[in-house]
Amino acid sequence: MSLEQEIKQIVESCGAKLYDIETVSDRGKTIYRVTITAPEGVDLQKCVEISNLISPLLDVHPPVSGDYNLEVSSPGVERKLKKPSHFEHSVGEKVRVTKNDGETIEGVLSDFRDHTLTLQTKNGPIEIPLDQITYAKTIFEW
């Protein structure tokens, strides 16, 4: 079983879902970031609970070489959309998509199937295959 699969099992045992795992560098420090979601939302207690369960696993199976900090958090209101499951769970939300050619499009994600998303824009619906997207995120309007 891969490290990601083991982390996913831990997250799900706590009533949450694994949204993403990434390793980032912030001000010279390496951060192993585990992002989770839950139907009732993610609070600090849930993050601490999951962090405390994942930490011993990472002590035995380090995710990166060298020093790192483990961070467990929610993806936030405005979240990156990378995986097909991210798009599937964001249907009905407003998103901003940057295509491979640099064009940026905003609209409501009305459908996602066969690795193609449909955005309802002010100029009508637009279909965009995932392989034409370099960056996508949800947008929260205050």
From Swiss-Prot:
Q: Give UniProt keywords alphabetically.
A: Cytoplasm, Ribosome biogenesis
> One Pfam family from the UniProt entry?
RimP_N
Q: Which GO terms describe its biological process?
A: ribosomal small subunit assembly; translation
UniProt-listed CDD domains: YlxS_C
Q: Does the keyword Cytoplasm apply?
A: yes
HAMAP family registered for this protein in UniProt: RimP
Instruction: Relate the protein's function as given in its record.
Output: Required for maturation of 30S ribosomal subunits.
Q: What is this protein called?
A: Ribosome maturation factor RimP
From what organism does this protein derive?
A: Nitratiruptor sp. (strain SB155-2)
